From Swiss-Prot:
Residues 4-88 form the BMC domain. One of its GO terms (cellular component) is bacterial microcompartment. This is Bacterial microcompartment shell protein PduJ. The lineage of its organism: Bacteria, Pseudomonadati, Pseudomonadota, Gammaproteobacteria, Enterobacterales. One of the major shell proteins of the bacterial microcompartment (BMC) dedicated to 1,2-propanediol (1,2-PD) degradation. At least one of PduA or PduJ is required for BMC assembly; it must be encoded as the first gene in the pdu operon. Required for structural integrity of BMCs and to mitigate propionaldehyde toxicity, probably joins facets responsible for BMC closure. Probably the hub for binding multiple enzymes to the interior of the BMC. Pathway: Polyol metabolism; 1,2-propanediol degradation. GO terms for biological process: propanediol catabolic process. InterPro entries: Bact_microcomp_CS, BMC_dom, BMC_shell, CcmK-like_sf, CcmK/CsoS1_BMC.
Length: 91
C-alpha cells in the first residue's frame, strides 16, 4: 500500500515534466498524475513509501527549479481517506 503523497507545483509545463521525470527516476514512487490549477500552475503527484516520496519530491523540486519556477512542494504521510477521495486514481 502506498502510504504517502508527494506534490510538486510548478509554473509551466516544462518544469512539471522535468519534476515528474526526476521524481520517478530518483526513488521507488508511482506517478499518480497531474492537475492543471490555472494561470499556468501545474501540480504533479506521486505515491509511495514516506522516505521514497520525500526523496522524490526533493529531486523533483530541484530539477524543476533548474528549468523553471517551483511554487510549492509538500509530502503528506498517510493521507486521510477523505483526502484520498479527491485524488486522481493511480493505474
Amino acid at each position: 500500500m502506498n502510504n504517502a503523497l508527494g506534490l510538486v507545483e510548478t509554473k509551466g509545463l516544462v518544469g512539471a515534466i522535468e519534476a515528474a521525470d526526476a521524481m520517478v527516476k530518483s526513488a521507488n514512487v508511482q506517478l499518480v498524475g497531474y492537475e492543471k490549477i490555472g494561470s499556468g500552475l501545474i501540480t504533479v503527484m506521486v505515491r509511495g513509501d514516506v522516505g521514497a516520496v520525500k526523496a522524490a519530491v526533493d529531486a523533483g523540486s530541484a530539477a524543476a527549479s533548474a528549468v523553471g519556477e517551483v511554487k510549492s512542494c509538500h509530502v503528506i504521510p498517510r493521507p486521510h481517506s477523505d483526502v484520498e477521495a479527491i485524488l486522481p486514481k493511480s493505474a
